[in-house]
């Protein structure tokens, strides 16, 4: 895609599907959670994908208690999401409890950003700015880290894990609320998943 709101999701999907096919993987493990987005709320722990890597929300296996159905045909695979039932708060509390090192982007820092349609994007060579979009230095952090072309920052003073946990507890916006690729349509994530996106 080209233009001001171009998405690079297709560039991520094709290599993923090629690697799964080439290596004949039975599954790929991901960190998606049901609380992130409504299409992911439909996702199973063992999420069936057809021989083209596509997701069909109507063709998912029942999961009763902790019993998972890993039966598949040749060429099909599963995306397995072991932390599917965790929340954003669960993640941050676990990181804090286990003292896990994480990228600095998750903490507040000074960065040049510009606003487009209510989302503050990092000023970067990968972003084509409109003439009226002026980069300003702000104190921000990223609640979710994805492609720079679709991931927005939030204004934040959260410089420690404790600060982040307090901020998440008080937040009124969703973790993916600053992802422009989710705002393309009501079914944007579901459409990407049907095409093979993780």
Residue ranges and their predicted role:
Residues 1-198:
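Nucleotide-activated chemistry modules centered on ATP-dependent adenylation/adenylyltransferase
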